[in-house]
């Protein structure tokens, strides 16, 4: 009796494994199509600006898999590299310089910004008070 139960369990394990492999293959095919279509390519580069008390380092991945997926699908990604624990005015001044540096490096006219938490405040300040509004195509803030 036990061998029959084992065979039944093995059957369900194999059935589940085959379904998972098929699903993974389908997902990879979709990812390949997305990559070849470059669905995340934008006219302007994207600047990711983190929130307070974080740094853009390779030791801690603040943004998770978002930058990787955006780049894999055609986007050009940059990071703020600013001191987020500084005042909004000081952080905004750093971000202004970073934006001008990126525009110079890429030759782009403008930049798209995705900012989290205090990074959004820093960017809004830079846009409204430091005169770079004409260099920013979009600002998306997330909480």
Q: What are the functions of these language-model segments?
A:
Residues 16-22, 26, 66-67, 90, ...:
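Residue-level signature of transmembrane alpha-helix interfaces in integral membrane proteins
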Residues 38-110:
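Active-site catalytic motif of lipid deacylating hydrolases and related acyltransferases
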Residues 1-64:
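Flexible, membrane-associating and regulatory peripheral segments of lipid-active enzymes
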Residues 50, 77, 93-143:
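Serine-dependent carboxylesterase/thioesterase catalytic core
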